[in-house]
Amino acid sequence: MPAVACYVDTSAAVYGGAGALSLPASEINFSGVPPTTTSTTVNQPPPPQQWSPSLSAELYRIDRWGPPYFAVNSSGNVTVKPFGDATLPHQEIDLLKVVKKVSDSKSSSGLGLHLPVIIRFPDVLKHRLESLQSAFDFAVRTHGYGSHYQGVYPVKCNQDRYIVEDIVEFGSGFRFGLEAGSKPELLMAMSSLCKGSPDSLLVCNGFKDAEYISLAIIGRKLGLNTVIVIEQEEEVDMAIELSRKMGIRPVVGVRAKLRTKHSGHFGSTSGEKGKFGLTTTQILRVVRKLENFGMLDCLQLLHFHIGSQIPTTTLLSDGVAEASQVYCELTRLGAHMRVIDIGGGLGIDYDGSKSGDSDLSVGYTLEEYASAVVGTVMSVCDRKGVKSPVICSESVRAIVSHHSILVFEAVSSSSSASPPMPGSTLALDYLVDGLTDEVKGEYRSLTAAAMRGEYESCLMYSGMLKQRCVELFKDGCLGMEQLAAVDGLCELVSKALGVADGVCTYNVNLSVFTSIPDFWGIGQLFPIMPIHRLDQQPKARGILSDLTCDSDGKIDKFIGDESSLPLHELSGGEGYYLGMFLGGAYEEALGGVHNLFGGPSVVRVQQSDGPQSYAVTRAVPGPSSSDVLRVMHHEPELMFQTLKHRAEECDNDYTAGPLADMLAQSFNSTPYLVPGHATGSCGFSNGSGLVNGCREYFYGVDDGCNAAAVDAAAGEEEQWSYVCA
């Protein structure tokens, strides 16, 4: 069933003489308030408070989940603070201005990209990385810890080239590394770290075959600090055999299955029955095998993972303490242990509740997390007389979630409480004339109850009237116009009595399955809110329905335990833009092509000293219809030629040329809806009517912004622009 809801809007047309279905206000009181019989003084409610951006910030909770990167400015727009609390007022970036720059046509000095769009802020990414490092550095100094922190970024959460390259560049000063979980990810990480610090860790996780392990060993030959983490016992046999054949001594680690278990959704793979890692018995067998081959000195790292979004430092400390005991025991057994990798788990506050009782939040700060880890490892190792290890973490959500914003447009809305059609008693006469005597009785009972002010009876008779009329329609005894009229009357009753469902459906130019797959898959909630008009009070509540032909393609749960979202009424001719925040981890990597909706356009925005305070340093248009067809092994060129040939054969009012042009335009255009009349597309024409490779990069700069910022971001790459067909 299509997820884009279709409603019978009784205000849209007058049905064949049905006229209106509003009861005369002078005769029947549907106000929901019994008429007063005595003269009393009624206290008037206080005048409504004037709406302000600060009230919107409270309403959408951005003042809780947004700091230090997101806020609402005095213009009523969401603003981005690229440097967190250190951002100066003139450095803040107005998100609406960025969206306008990206989506406006090139003739209007825009980039001409279609929404939805992912806007990435590398300044925020850098600040997150530096904040994580600073938190651990502070904990190391405070506790007097005998080693240091050295993190890695698991590329599985977002393998985008520019995110990975940014992290390597931003983190090279403190030896920040990468983690891979497959052969393609390992190849990517090896290539990327050639530009990083030689001391950066390259942690090789996941299930492995001989080729995977060989690649990791080759990495050490190339001067990369690769560590093969043994997750299955047979992997150590391959590592021993291959390293001996290649004449290269590897560095290996073991992943331990801890007894400490995270009870939330994200801890489902933790504990003794977890998907990954080795039991205590298996770890001992790995140690013996390495010892038998004189390679126990190669065992240098212990890895574990309690689960993502660890809710409290109490649970964190329990897991780290258990793992630290394992680390100390491995040292006692003769391994040359050097690194303890605590995995992921550093959570973020999706709903602003700062609660340790929810999968959507955590009950600690970044500094408290780092202090708990460092203090616990130090306590166990000092007690056992073991040298403090390098502490590594794979804190992916905390690194990348904030730097990426998905912006999409609400293209229409459908209210379940439509206004009545104009008219009066003629419509009622038309309706009554078409009813059976039994149903006329229900109608008379309804009007009588309304006259007496018996409002519960009104609802009962209204429901009975509607049910009887539906039965008549199914039997072919009632016309569609009359059925619509009955719906309008019953809707009017519900609205007048204040019991009508006031939740609207806002149809959005988006695919939930492509852009927010975690919502569909596991019910993960992200902050969603309008990015503008926040100086105006939202008068509606709505759910969001996407473009896909799937009933699951909707967003009907929101942070704050809400089943609808406060929204503004749509204004004709003006776009209404919504943003999904804190979705920089996993969503792009997990998204599919359901209904052949491809990924959004992507732009990279950096802070600039120009008057607009930002510069668009990279833009990638979203895939065209041809692009997503190729993903499913179709050949758009052959499809186009087939349809073009059919057009030439058909005898119709159109010539073959215009038909072919229209077909080519459809292949080249975005799979998403295009506002207005423009259906242009991005790419380079090959002369056959189709566009090849709509994936080139655009380096642009806002009017008045510092062009040097763009040149620096472009580096040594050739600068491209794209054309719109």
UniProtKB/Swiss-Prot annotation:
UniProt keyword Lyase present: yes
Its keywords, alphabetically, are: Decarboxylase, Lyase, Magnesium, Putrescine biosynthesis, Pyridoxal phosphate, Spermidine biosynthesis
Kindly state a single biological-process term from the GO annotations of this entry: spermidine biosynthetic process
Q: Which GO terms describe its molecular function?
A: arginine decarboxylase activity
Query: Which superkingdom heads the taxonomic lineage of this protein's source?
Result: Eukaryota
- EC annotation from Swiss-Prot or TrEMBL: 4.1.1.19
Q: Which InterPro entries match?
A: Ala_racemase/Decarboxylase_C, Arg_decrbxlase, De-COase2_CS, De-COase2_N, De-COase2_pyr-phos_BS, Orn/DAP/Arg_de-COase, PLP-binding_barrel
Q: Where does substrate bind?
A: I340, D341, I342, G343, G344, G345, L346, G347, I348, D349, Y350
Top enzyme class, one word, equals lyase
Family that this chain belongs to: Belongs to the Orn/Lys/Arg decarboxylase class-II family. SpeA subfamily.
**Matching PANTHER family:** ARGININE DECARBOXYLASE, ARGININE DECARBOXYLASE 1, CHLOROPLASTIC-RELATED
The protein in question is named Arginine decarboxylase
Q: Which gene encodes it?
A: ADC
